[in-house]
């Protein structure tokens, strides 16, 4: 068997690690590890259900809008999640209903300017996605994988929040 890597985790350069921790806690992340001075850490790792993120203190100012990074998260109740963020002082736009995510989506920026798309993932969309994956496998568009339909039932957030 060929060696492989696993557990892909974005590492974001940030201007203030503590500020990023506070913001990502509002998104449901838990602080897992911290390096450096606890008052002004140089690195942190946070986990949420189904994902992780790390922060590295930037040595000089940078423009995150020039980085080609877009993150996506899923919420089982996007309107309630939006209200939670608003109640905690986060500037959150209205929910939109684009064709690729008809049950709702919003985009916001974290304190360093990184874009975070948050999508409502409904039962109907999840079932349609599972059916689409199965059909692509039958049509030979996707290879058979080690992930069965049952294993994919829990992706991305089914019954975990």
Predicted segments, located by residue:
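Short, flexible, solvent-exposed loop/turn segments with mixed acidic/basic and small polar residues
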Residues: 1, 59-62
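Residue-level structural signal for beta-strand termini and adjacent loop
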Residues: 37, 58-59, 119-121
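Vicinal oxygen chelate
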Residues: 6-16, 44-47, 62-161, ...
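A short local loop/turn or secondary-structure capping micro-motif enriched for an aromatic residue
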Residues: 61-65, 124-127
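A short beta-turn/loop motif at secondary-structure boundaries
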Residues: 37-38, 61-63, 98-100
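Core segments of cupin and vicinal oxygen chelate
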Residues: 2-4, 11-53
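A sequence-level detector of short linear motifs
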Residues: 54-55, 117
């Amino acid at each position: 068997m060929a060696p492989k890597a696993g557990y892909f985790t974005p590492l974001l350069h940030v201007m203030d690690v503590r500020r990023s921790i506070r913001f990502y806690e509002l998104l449901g992340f838990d602080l897992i590890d911290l390096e450096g001075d606890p008052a002004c850490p140089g690195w942190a790792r946070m986990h949420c259900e189904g994902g992780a993120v790390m922060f590295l203190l930037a040595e000089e100012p940078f423009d995150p809008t020039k980085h080609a990074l877009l993150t996506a998260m899923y919420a089982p109740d996007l309107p309630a999640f939006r209200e939670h963020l608003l109640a905690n002082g986060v500037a959150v736009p209205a929910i939109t209903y684009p064709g690729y995510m008809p049950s709702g989506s919003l985009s916001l920026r974290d304190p360093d300017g990184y874009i975070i798309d948050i999508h409502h993932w409904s039962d109907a969309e999840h079932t349609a996605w599972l059916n689409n994956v199965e059909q692509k496998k039958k049509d030979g568009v996707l290879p058979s994988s080690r992930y069965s339909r049952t294993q994919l039932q829990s992706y991305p957030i089914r019954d975990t929040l």
